Amino acid sequence: AGAALEDGAEEKPGEEDNFDNITPVVPASNKLNIPASVWDKSTKERGEEISNYDNTVVKRNLDSSEFKDISIFSESEKYIARTHSMDTDMIEYQDGSKFLRAIKKDMKRLEGFSKQGNITPDKYNKKYYYLVLKNKELSVDQQKAIVAATEYASRNGIVLKLYTTE
């Protein structure tokens, strides 16, 4: 551990996720009013559609051409958020440790965010990471990855919230 991983996500020594010792838990998730058909689209199109879907907590309110690391800012509730959708059917994500690495690699963009434009640290005190998945049962390995990702987020001042499409 501590060596650079093949996908570019680097872990600090002592930050390994002792994957075998994680107890799998079926994570509680919230269903979004987004049709399952979004999963038939390309990754980029799916992400854009999910983050532009009206009346959902994951709806982007920041300009995507300017804000790459966060997609949501609430000045009244003092939080920033990043939404990430992942297709759990992808062969690569059947491997729980690869699934976890991909989540953490993306989450580091939110973790590293402090200020941009008029969004400065004095205007928010919470960071949310909205992970959007298909509405289907996760494998034991994927459940372990979500548990580890939630713990990782918590250690780094982030609240991971899990959502599913219809």
Model-derived regions, located:
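Residue-level detector of intrinsically disordered/flexible regions characterized by low predicted structural confidence
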Residues: 14, 20-23, 129, 138, ...
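A generic structural motif
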Residues: 156-166
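Secretion-targeting segments and adjacent low-complexity export tracts
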Residues: 78-82
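Hydrophobic, gly/ala-rich membrane-insertion helices/peptides used by toxins and envelope proteins
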Residues: 1-23
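Surface-exposed polar/charged interaction patches
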Residues: 7, 11, 15, 53-56, ...
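Catalytic cores of nucleic-acid endonucleases
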Residues: 60-67, 84-158
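Acidic-basic catalytic patches of nuclease active cores, encompassing PD-(D/E)XK
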Residues: 17-68, 73-76
